[in-house]
Amino acid sequence: MIITRTPFRISFFGGGTDYPDWYNNNPGAVISTTINKYCYITCRPLPPFFDYKYRIRYHKKEETKNIQEIKHPSVRECLKYTKTIQGLEIVHHADLPARSGLGSSSTFTVGMLHALNALHGKMMSKRQLALDAIDIEQNIIKENVGSQDQTNAAFGGFNHIEFNKTKKIIVNPIILSKMKISKISSHLMLFFTGFSRTASDISKHQITAIKKNKIDMTHNYELVEEA
């Protein structure tokens, strides 16, 4: 049995400049950090005694005979991406609900990839996990997502992350003393409003507006460098 624990994130500066539509033509950067709230993925081989091959548990229950029947897009495409053909039971648990604005879908994808690769006996680098998750979400599932959530989930920690048209993601850890980290934490408050929303829908409007809001986007990038 493989269990992965992958952190959620909060973003401070640079949001929007991590979309490929922006950083393919302009420099992009964010300052963000992962937090002590996690997504847990449990993955184990399923004995061949059932009339289905894949048993998947999240807020829904799925039992399917083949990968193509799986409705959860990230589970389905991660299985294909890692060329996993054996029967599996996959169970998802999380400290926070989905669609809470903390990068939960990308955190799930990174954790799923990590679990499946571990099941195959492969230890992926943080960078490769991030790049694979970005590829799956942006190019295969066609989600309207940026590139910071996957990078944060894969690398963890407090980081200054740079994006550019070469597709090379540069992760610069922000090294702070325990005293400074404690001071920052003591000035942060995070609330759950009880409302949820689909990030892809919001991002779709943001991506459409990128060309129109170049001044604002450039300012977002400059704020990162100033911070």
Regions found by a protein language model. Give the residues of each.
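Short glycine/proline-enriched turns and hinge-like loops at secondary-structure junctions
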Residues: 23-25, 103-104, 144-145
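Residues at or immediately flanking beta-strands
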Residues: 87-89
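DPxDG-like acidic metal-binding loop motif
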Residues: 102-126
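Short, well-ordered coil loops that connect the C-terminus of an alpha-helix to the N-terminus
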Residues: 84-85, 122
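Short pre-catalytic strand/loop immediately N-terminal to key active-site residues, enriched for Gly-Thr
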Residues: 96-100
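C-terminal nucleotide
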Residues: 1-13, 18-21, 30-32, 36-84, ...
